[in-house]
Amino acid sequence: MNYFVHESSYIDDDVYIGEGTRIWHFCHVQKGARIGRECSMGQNVNISNNVRIGNYVKIQNNVSVYE
């Protein structure tokens, strides 16, 4: 595992998280989501089912991303 997920975050099954990505407090990455390398998901971010996030993306606190 070459990425960081804070212990308060929840990662569903069938999720890809790229190398060097950081997922901070109280995030939820839902089934089928794909997050590229060297990304940062701020506190309380929700990545919905099947969403694709590219490389080097920063998503700030309290943001939800839907397909």
Describe the residue ranges of each PLM region.
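Left-handed beta-helix
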Residues: 6-7, 12-13, 18-19, 24-25, ...
